[in-house]
């Protein structure tokens, strides 16, 4: 990871020679108004990665906040995702163009397949379409989300292109050790979502004990733990104060004993849908 602390997140190298901030704001389940306010607040404190999706229905709101910020496009990293209903070779290309129109952008920095939806059997063809989107300049990097080892290796084997990122549910209750290892073996960056476990660990004695030791919030400790696993991380909040606090995690480092204590919370609890059975969004 490279970069400086404080005003901006460090960046991580992707396998396609692009770089991506290690920490960014996600806007899942936020209304248009909440999205605009959250994105504006995040940009204000130096966050430069904004993660949205066609299925969230708020790409236009993200675009408005970006436009209003006046921040040069080259300084931003914008991710969107292919909705399951648009999967397919041509569908993936057309959906990327539709997302760009809603965002008011000429390209996205990262375009992901939102869910594998294996029952559909179209995720490989979809990735083929995304390769075309990258080739025509609509997406700088392409990747996947919620892909297990099976789906990830299938895409690589059948398209001969390795996704830059695999964005997955990852928090201390579901630390995804095996999948992180698989991603790393393929030089795929693991990007975590739901890193705060939907607040379920805010009052956990282990997390609170570690937080007290560093004078940090539970959320800051959970984000720091995730970052120190060499993951990129997407957090979500509609609260400007929480966004500022959650982004302020580059001035401390958890000791090995505290990393181990948080790792020990892993019990396989999944808070989001199971990629093997979920029909996608």
Swiss-Prot record:
GO terms for molecular function: aldo-keto reductase (NADPH) activity. It comes from the Bacteria. It is an enzyme of class 1 (oxidoreductase). The active site is at residue 56. InterPro entries: AKR, Aldo/ket_reductase_CS, NADP_OxRdtase_dom, NADP_OxRdtase_dom_sf. Its EC number is 1.1.1.-. Keywords: NADP, Oxidoreductase. The keyword NADP applies. NADPH binds at residues 196, 234, 236-238, 245, 272. It holds the Pfam family Aldo_ket_red. SUPFAM superfamilies: NAD(P)-linked oxidoreductase. Gene3D superfamilies: NADP-dependent oxidoreductase domain. Belongs to the aldo/keto reductase family. This is Aldo-keto reductase MAP_3007. It comes from Mycolicibacterium paratuberculosis (strain ATCC BAA-968 / K-10) (Mycobacterium paratuberculosis).
């Amino acid at each position: 990871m490279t970069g400086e602390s404080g005003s901006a997140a460090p960046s991580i190298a992707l396998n396609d020679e692009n770089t991506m901030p290690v920490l960014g704001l996600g806007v899942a389940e936020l209304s248009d108004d909440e999205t605009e306010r959250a994105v504006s607040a995040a940009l204000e404190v130096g966050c430069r990665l904004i993660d949205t999706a066609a299925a969230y229905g708020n790409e236009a709101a993200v675009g408005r906040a970006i436009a209003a910020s006046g921040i040069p496009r080259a300084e931003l990293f914008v991710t969107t995702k292919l909705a399951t209903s648009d999967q397919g070779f041509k569908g993936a290309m057309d959906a990327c163009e539709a997302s760009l129109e809603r965002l008011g952008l000429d390209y996205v920095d990262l375009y992901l397949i939102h869910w594998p939806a294996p029952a559909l059997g179209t995720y490989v063809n979809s990735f083929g379409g995304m390769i075309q989107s990258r080739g025509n300049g609509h997406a700088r990097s392409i990747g996947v989300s919620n892909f297990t080892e099976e789906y990830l290796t299938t895409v690589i084997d059948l398209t001969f292109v390795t996704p830059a990122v695999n964005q997955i549910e990852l928090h201390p209750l579901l630390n995804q050790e095996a999948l992180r290892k698989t991603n790393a073996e393929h030089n795929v960056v693991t990007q975590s979502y739901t890193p705060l476990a939907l607040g379920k660990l805010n009052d956990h004695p282990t997390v609170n004990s570690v937080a007290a030791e560093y004078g940090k919030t539970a959320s800051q400790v959970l984000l720091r733990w995730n970052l120190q696993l060499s993951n990129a991380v997407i957090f979500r909040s509609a609260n400007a104060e929480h966004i500022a606090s959650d982004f302020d995690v580059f001035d401390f480092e958890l000791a090995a004993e505290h990393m181990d204590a948080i790792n020990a919370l892993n019990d396989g609890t999944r808070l989001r849908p199971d990629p093997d059975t979920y029909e996608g969004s």
